[in-house]
A protein has these predicted regions:
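Low-complexity, highly charged intrinsically disordered N-terminal segments
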Residues: 81-83
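Aromatic-anchored, charged helix-turn/loop surface patch used as a conserved interaction hotspot
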Residues: 105, 110-116
Length: 316
């Protein structure tokens, strides 16, 4: 699957002092957002997030419009909400951008600022449209689809489902893990479909993928194309690793990206994978206890010659 057009899928961790990247994102967002008839902030007040409600207080009430499917009966303090925005320098728009930027520094923490939305719809109409799309069903199972979390939304089109589309907004913008401004596809008529089982399975891999992204900078200074991570995650699933084996999955994906692009075919590695699949020994443990000579041989790739000979693929 190719990346959706318009999504920049190269990754590098944002630096707190990278004012150039930050200013470009802020300027582009302001220009995009306030072209719309109505502009909104989408907030997910996850437990433990300090949210200064003074910015949304209007008289004795608040400009927060709760967005949550009634069927789920979420408590009010756990409901996502919309906040109407105006193009005021130094106002809530600029303040929430600072929050969104700072939250990138801790990928494990809650992300209250999820998106900035442009729409032709009045807030109550948008609220209704969004609530319906957040409620998803598979068989008898009904659940809250938290597609709006940036750690989910940045992978939706390229990894989960290329048909993903939101109904209601004219634009849906967010900051990805690298601090770049991204947008999700939107549609005036179509809405998010109930996900197929295969899409649900891919959703289960997003926590692992984000863990790989967060670990990458500690191993290399290289900027990685996220498609390599996606491909390795697909291979991890194909060889039988499960998202619940997160340490094994993270280790394998990193090895496939940074050590050898066909590492799963190495005779020793295939044994590690088989043991992990059968719950005999974690892949990460076997890999950690392998000697330097083993890793040197895997990285060199000479073992592929013997593999190709056995498969009748020797040339020359």
């Amino acid at each position: 699957m190719q990346p959706e057009e318009g999504l920049d899928v190269s990754l590098s961790r944002p630096l707190s002092d990278d004012e150039g990247l930050k200013w470009d994102a802020l300027t582009s967002l302001r220009e995009r957002l306030f072209k719309a008839k109505h502009s909104y902030l989408f907030v997910d007040p996850t437990s433990g997030v300090p949210w200064d409600r003074s910015y949304t207080k209007v008289g004795d009430s608040y400009s927060e419009v709760l967005v949550a499917p009634r069927k789920l009966n979420l408590p009010k303090d756990a409901c996502p909400f919309l906040v109407p925005l105006s193009n005021e320098v130094g106002g809530i728009f600029d303040w929430t951008f600072e929050i969104a930027w700072s939250q990138l520094s801790d990928p494990q923490a809650p992300y209250p600022v999820c998106a900035w939305i442009g729409s032709d719809l009045e807030v109550r109409n948008l609220q209704s449209r969004m609530s319906k799309q957040m409620l998803q069903s598979v068989g008898v199972r009904t659940w809250l689809f938290r597609f709006y979390d940036p750690r989910v939304s940045q992978h939706l089109v390229s990894f989960v489902s290329k048909e993903f589309c939101i109904s209601g907004p004219t634009s849906w913008s967010f900051l990805d893990a690298s601090g770049r401004l991204q947008k999700l596809p939107v549609s005036e008529t179509e809405s998010i479909r109930d996900p197929e089982e295969s899409s649900l399975e891919r959703l289960d891999w997003l926590k692992t993928i984000n863990a790989v992204i967060n670990t990458w900078p500690s191993l290399t200074d290289d900027i990685v194309e996220i498609e390599r991570i996606y491909d390795a995650a697909r291979v991890a699933a194909a060889v039988g690793l499960q998202p619940c084996q997160q340490a094994d999955c993270v280790a394998f994906i990193l090895h496939r990206c940074l050590v050898h692009e066909r590492i799963e075919l190495h005779p020793i590695v295939s044994v590690w994978l088989n043991d992990a699949r059968e719950m005999k020994r974690p892949y990460a443990d076997a890999a950690a206890h392998a000697g330097a000579d083993v890793w040197k041989g895997i990285s060199a790739g000479d073992w592929q010659l013997g593999l190709n000979e056995r498969q009748g693929l020797r040339y020359g």
